[in-house]
């Protein structure tokens, strides 16, 4: 049998319980259902680290007529006021709180008297429960920490609820924000297998740590995660007693790759125009990245598109929870973002092409529907990814370029048997900083469809382009650089963090003498902080060599 045909059959078999529709473009057929049921929610029941700006969505097996009286959203201060709008002919109800939810708080959503000709819709456990994240930078410590003690809040995958795999990355959420300079792979943080340190990429931001092994782990041999007490929070406090967790990686082979298209909302129209394709979950334009902030206004949005190469684990070995991954280096590219001063006055330039790069393998799972045991209920999809967000125009990159860790998409997957395609719809929230002064937010309505003809589907492009220095700070404004300001190198694409080595591939001198410095990677940038900080009347030089590479291994064009 042709391998590409086998891929389609394998992918369809994974979702065979999901059914396929012949009516609406991306809905499951519920014609044989005996009663109306909830089939999806965002956030999912039990989800943590939810953005306070997130919508709350409930999706039903049938169209329903609802208003705010049919839902109760309860938080730490009692009932939350919100508005409701429908999507997909009434199959989805989107609740928008009148103001942002409280940080680090528990919320519960219940349904009230949603009656249809097919019965009353209900949530099996009575409510959808979720927790919001702690506050981000610029807020008091009490709001930025989940608890008064510094420790590990969660590890994913945990090996229980979600299986740990031979291609798993490890995502940790801490209770308090980290001092990133104390989180050093191979020193204060390690993964070991068979007594050897596993080569891995480490990414740190806020309360999040991502550990992405460079190579596949060996199945059948335990992997141990260790954090020493050398890991510190922003306030200089150590991780008392450290932290240890052991995993047993499961074999996901043989795998198949399913090529999916993330098509634009419209080939010609913009995301904010009438008539573009919308998400059945939210009713918003698909594959658009909106950014809402006081500095930007609420009309800043980029239309994204690209191909996603989803690698599926061997389904017979994972009948209930099927793992998948999207390889690092995957790209989504999009239209320019408008740059406005105060969200209103045009700045006279746009961002140029917007690129979203997968910094590591995005890990995900297709899970049994948590709300319905009907064989036609769609599978739940969870996908976690670390991405770099950058723009073509460097003047705009100062506002938008950054790394976003552990972005979580929650959706569902169905099999359209008439098209011969697997269809994914998902929702997530991104919260990038704008100019380092404000946290913007955007609700992503992600949509992908596998190519029906996998034999002739696109192949993943090989990156053979070397990263170049696109801009740097202070650049031509050296006389405006203040003591204590960082030196920032902006490259044309994200870099491999393991190749940026202080005193080797990256050097800083002051009046010709080497100086110590701290640094971190953010998006396509290296942010350098000399130790001691920049001094008046001192000539500094920064040099990087071709030992620095992009995430595909292409060497940089060295420069001083």
Language-model features, listed with the residues they occupy:
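Sec-dependent signal peptide recognition
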Residues: 2-9
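C-terminal motif of bacterial Sec signal peptides marking the signal peptidase cleavage site
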Residues: 15-17
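N-terminal non-catalytic regions of secreted/periplasmic and cell-surface proteins
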Residues: 19-72, 106-108, 112, 119-188, ...
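Short beta-strand segments enriched for Tyr within beta-sheet-rich domains
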Residues: 60, 105-114, 174, 221-227, ...
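Aromatic sugar-binding surface patches on proteins
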Residues: 89-95, 205-211, 522-528
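Surface-exposed, short loops/turns at beta-strand junctions within beta-sandwich domains
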Residues: 99-105, 215-221, 532-538
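Beta-sandwich strand segments
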Residues: 116-127, 233-244, 396-400, 435-443, ...
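Extracytosolic secretory-pathway proteins
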Residues: 182, 251-468, 477-479
């Amino acid at each position: 049998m042709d391998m590409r045909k086998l891929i389609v059959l394998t992918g369809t078999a994974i979702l065979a319980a999901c059914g396929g529709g012949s009516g609406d473009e991306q809905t499951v057929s519920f014609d044989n259902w005996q009663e109306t049921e909830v089939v999806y929610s965002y956030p999912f029941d039990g989800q943590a680290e939810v953005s306070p700006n997130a919508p709350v969505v409930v999706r039903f097996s049938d169209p329903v007529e609802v208003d705010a009286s049919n839902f109760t959203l309860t938080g730490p201060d009692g009932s939350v006021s919100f508005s409701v709008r429908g999507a997909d002919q009434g199959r989805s109800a989107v609740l928008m709180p009148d103001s942002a939810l409280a940080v680090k708080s528990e919320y519960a959503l219940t349904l009230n008297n949603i009656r249809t000709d097919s019965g009353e819709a209900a949530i099996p456990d009575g409510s959808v429960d979720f927790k919001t994240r702690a506050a981000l930078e610029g807020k008091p410590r009490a709001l930025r920490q989940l608890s008064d003690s510094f420790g590990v809040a969660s590890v994913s995958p945990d090996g229980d609820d979600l299986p740990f795999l031979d291609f798993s990355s490890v995502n940790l959420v801490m209770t308090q924000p980290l001092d990133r300079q104390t989180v050093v792979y191979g020193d204060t943080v390690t993964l070991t297998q068979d007594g050897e340190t596993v080569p891995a990429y480490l990414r740190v931001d806020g309360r999040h740590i991502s550990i992405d092994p460079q190579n596949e782990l060996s199945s059948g041999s335990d992997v141990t995660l260790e954090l020493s007490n050398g890991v510190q929070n922003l306030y200089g406090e150590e991780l008392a007693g450290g932290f240890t967790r052991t995993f047993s990686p499961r074999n996901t082979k043989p795998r198949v790759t399913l090529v999916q298209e993330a098509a634009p909302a419209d080939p010609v129209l913009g995301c904010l125009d009438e008539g573009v394709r919308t998400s059945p979950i939210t009713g918003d334009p698909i594959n658009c990245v909106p950014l809402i902030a006081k500095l930007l206004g609420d009309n800043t949005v980029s239309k994204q598109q690209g191909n996603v190469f989803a690698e599926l684990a061997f389904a017979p070995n994972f009948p209930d929870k099927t793992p998948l991954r999207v390889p690092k280096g995957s790209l989504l590219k999009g239209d320019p973002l408008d740059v406005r001063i105060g969200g209103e006055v045009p700045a006279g330039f746009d961002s140029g092409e917007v690129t979203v790069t997968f910094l590591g393998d995005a890990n995900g799972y297709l899970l049994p529907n948590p709300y319905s045991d009907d064989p036609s209920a769609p599978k739940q999809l969870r996908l976690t990814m670390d991405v770099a967000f950058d723009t073509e125009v460097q003047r705009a990159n100062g506002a938008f370029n950054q790394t976003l860790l552990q972005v979580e998409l929650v959706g569902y997957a169905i099999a359209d048997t008439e098209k011969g395609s697997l269809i994914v719809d998902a929702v997530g929230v991104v919260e990038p900083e704008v100019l380092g002064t404000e946290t913007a937010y955007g609700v992503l309505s992600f949509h992908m469809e596998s190519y029906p003809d996998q034999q002739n589907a696109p192949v993943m492009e090989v990156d053979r382009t070397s990263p170049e220095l696109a801009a740097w700070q202070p650049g031509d404004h050296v006389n405006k650089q203040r003591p204590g300001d960082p030196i920032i190198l902006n490259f044309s694409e994200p870099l491999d963090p393991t190749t940026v080595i202080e005193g080797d591939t990256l050097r800083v001198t002051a009046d010709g003498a080497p100086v110590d410095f701290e640094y971190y990677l953010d998006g396509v940038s290296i942010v350098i902080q000399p130790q001691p900080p920049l001094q008046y009347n001192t000539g500094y030089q920064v040099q990087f060599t071709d030992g620095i590479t992009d995430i595909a291994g292409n060497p940089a064009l060295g420069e001083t």
